[in-house]
Structure formats: structure tokens, C-alpha cells
């Protein structure tokens, strides 16, 4: 394939040509300017009011914080003694009167106290709901309805309201009824999803072959993200029709869906997908490997990528034994371990940055080649949390914010992941005192003191 127009040509999924580097450099510079400061830029949800009422429900806390980042006025309703989630923290450390997990999800929120089991508290909540666009209910299923302030009541009084309920099992199954008093925890949500059964070393003997949970609150963040997506979709529907609706989010369902094809695998092949550890059922190599000074991530999605990886490592001799796709993609773990052992012997000889440099050099040459099938293997460094915080790349993207912790040093917390040119998310405040905004919100919404 020749360059007839003088413009960069595309081979596979890569841009090549003499002007490609200049083009990408200019484009990067343009985007860097567009994705910079959020100052003086509009907020996408500026006209939206969301009321969050939850106790010890981190998916609800996280979802409400996401709406707040995009400009919604988020009012966090707590009982007079505060949300029990405030007490969750490593080593009992409190920042600004709350545990770090709670503080992180306090972005841009207003905090008020209401006793929903009192007549005055319920009347005040009704006043809030009458002017709200969204309610996020993170209490036990059925509690709000039993107090006369749930979706069933508000759908008649306020038909445009979007009512988002987040709980372990949702609201409308027999299990949801039977387990309604079980608190929402990330651990139980993972357990009910089948996900922990897929994690761990497949070769581990008894008693080490037990299920493993993800090292982060995966179910909480996944269910919060999906609940937020449901909320935004419901807002679009309301814009077209004027109709509100209920969004029912079950946290265990969220992480079940997150597994993707793992669930479908059992139905398709009439066999469960078992744990494969550092292997993958569809790709090989596709995992973490020891280098001279740490770990690297190695991925070769296609045969061409695999051959490119062999060339980078100087092990072209292996191609004769493993040249076909199904020689590498197999559920025979013992067979995979043979090839993995060869990779381990080579990767341990190199420093991480040297492996990355060699891979980038190979990919640059492959992109310029007029021959298809050169392959683009991937080798990147596997980073520790400390290394992530030190990465210049994430600093340029403003991926982490610094906040006054009241302790020695400043607190670093994750910022919003999507970078947007016209209506970017932002963190304007990080305060979460119990009832700190009572006076302001009570006056604004005409609540009874």
C-alpha cells in the first residue's frame, strides 16, 4: 500500500507516515489546552438537585459524589448522629471528623441532618423531594416506603422525580425481601457474584485454593458507576418526556455483569470457568511477570503480536513450537506453564524500563513497515500505588487532588477520571461535618427547624 496523497496512511490500527509524529504532537498540545483548568467552564448538571439518603452504603455515597462532580447540587441527609460509614477507616484514622473513605466521597456535597422516623423529619424530607430531580436511596429496601416517603408515594406527588435505589439485591425479588436487613458490603456483593471463585492461583494446594476477593472495593465502585449511568439516562428520558422513573441497582448484580463473558462461558461450553490465575482463557501471554527490578505486564493478543514479542526477547526459536493460535490458547495449564517458563527466563534478564523501551522501539518500526502482520506486543511496567502517585503522566492529567488533612502532610485523593473540554467535572469542596449545612439548606428549601 503506497502513500498516494502525501497524507498519513493507516496500517492495522496504527497511524504512519512522515507527518504522523508532528500531527500527533500538535493534536496532543491542542487537547492539553482544552482539557486544562475547569475554571470559568459550565457544569453539565448545574440545574440538577440530588438528595442522597443512605447509611453505611458506599455505592450510594460514591454515586452521589459523581453527580456532584458534574455540577449537581447534592444534599446528603443523615440522622442526627451521622452516617455510620463515617467510622470506616484504616487504623481508626479520622480526617476532618470522618474516615478517609467517607471523606473521599464527600466531594461537593451539602450535609444536613433529619430524623426520618419523626413526623417533622418526614415532612422536611417531602419538601426536599418536591424540589429535587433525583433521590438516591441507600437505606434498607422498603424502609422509605414504610415511612411514606418512598418511590411509590413520590411517583404520584412528583411524577418527574428520578428515584435511584441501591441495595445488595434490589427491591423486587424474594431474595431482596428475605435479605432486606443485610447491610450493603463490597465483600458480600463480590461473594454473591461468583467473581472471587475466578481469582487466585489455580495450582495452589489445599488449604490455599480458597476464593479471593478483589483488593479494592470493586463491587461498590462498579454498582455506583452503573447507578450513575442509569441516573443520567433517566434524566435524558425526563428531558424528552417529562417522566421520572425508578432506577433499581443491586450491587451484587453489578459485579456479576462486570465479569462479561465469564458467566456466558459456562452456558456456551457447558462447563464452569475455573480460576486461571495469571493466565487468561482467551489470550497468552497476558499477565504479570518478574523483571530484574520489579514486575512488568506482557500481552500478545494475536499470533503476529506473539511473534513480535519473541523477536523483542530474542527467542525466535520458540516460534517453531508455538506458531499456531491454539497451541497457546488452551485450558491445559500444564502446557501453558512450559511456555510461561521460557518467558520468565528471558524477562528476568531485563530491567523494566529496558523492556518498555525495546517494545516501543519495535512498535515504532512495525508501524512504519508497509508489510502487514508485524504485530504490536505490549510490555508496560506494573506499578505499585506509590509509583502511580509519582507518575508524571497522572500528574499532568490531574488524576489526584491534594487536600488539607489536618494531620501531618496533605491528603492525596483520586480526582474525576473523564477529562472533558467544555463541561469538565471538578471538586469544589471537600468538607463533611455532620449537619454543617443545616442553616443554609433549611432556609433555602423552607424546612422546619
State where each predicted segment sits.
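A glycine-rich dinucleotide-binding beta-alpha-beta segment and adjacent secondary-structure elements
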Residues: 372-424
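Glycine-rich beta-alpha junction loops
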Residues: 81, 168-170, 251-256, 293, ...
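An anion-binding loop in the catalytic cleft
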Residues: 33-36, 291-294, 351-354, 364, ...
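Short Gly/Pro-enriched turn/cap motifs at secondary-structure boundaries
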Residues: 270-281, 286-287, 408-411, 430-434
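N-terminal helix-loop segment corresponding to the beta1-alpha1 unit
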Residues: 2-243, 433, 437-449
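Aromatic-enriched alpha-helical interface/lid elements that frame and gate functional surfaces
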Residues: 285-286, 290-374
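A short glycine-threonine-serine/GTX helix/turn-capping micro-motif
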Residues: 211-222, 244-246, 276-277, 284-286, ...
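Substrate-binding/catalytic subdomain of NAD(P)-dependent oxidoreductase enzymes
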Residues: 235-277
